[in-house]
Amino acid sequence: MVGDDVSVEDLLKGIIVASGNDACVALAEGIAGTEEQFAILMTEKAKEIGMENTNFSNSSGINDPYNYSTVKDILIMSNYLIKNYPEYYEYFKEKEFTWDRTGGDPITQGNRNPLLYKNIGADGIKTGYLAVEKYSLASSIQKNERRLIAVASGFNTKNDRSRQSIKLLTWGITNFDLIKISSKDTALTEVDVWLGKTNKVGVYTKENIFTTIKKARKKKIKAFIEYDGPIEAPITKDQELGKLKVLFNNELINTYPVYALNDVKKVNLFSRIIKSINYLIWGDV
């Protein structure tokens, strides 16, 4: 009702759960002054996160020739949302939202995402409809540490949109595996140290590293540590020491920095001389 105070959290839930265009406008004007200025900020953020073929002309996504995106860009945005704003992504799986308005009965509205009502474990994301692109849906499920996001558009009916999105997610779960390459903050392997009080030091990655691959091609994934070694002491904990390289079919697909798991102090002068002699004679670090 006119004059009601609505919290930002309720406005967000109104947008996410109930697809409220009025809530979009209210937040846009509250943040940027006008909806037009907010759309400019939206477009700038889209470019920043890699959405190269997207332009926003309004805050709600209603039909406008200057309001456009692509399936790929919506996938990028969905992934960014889930990774960076998990506290808000929780709202996307809520099946309904009730607003206790002032001076009237509470209003309850349901989530329009049809996959939330299917027994497949979907927890988002959003439906859409435009005159040209017809019905669209960005959807997501998570099973066993593995998240799949499917974005589909161009369906003539809501039923087609729902059915094909389920098929796409099911195909991804059935035909692909998630392989864990490295566990965050856990020793991955050891590298050689020169002139240190220990001859080796463990290395780790600062993030969990996974790769998704077709089940039939799992054996073609390989990973190794590349470093310029032996690495001369002293070494400090968290010092970058090399790269973890991930290959598919012997072609590089990703590179990640690896860091020292702990400090390694340099040996004293006498020990350095002995180690140098050993290295010259035996090649022993």
Residue ranges and their predicted role:
Residues 1-83:
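Active-site-adjacent loops and short helices of periplasmic peptidoglycan-processing enzymes
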Residues 51-52, 66-68, 72-285:
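Domain-terminus/edge residues, biased toward the C-terminal soluble/receptor-binding domains
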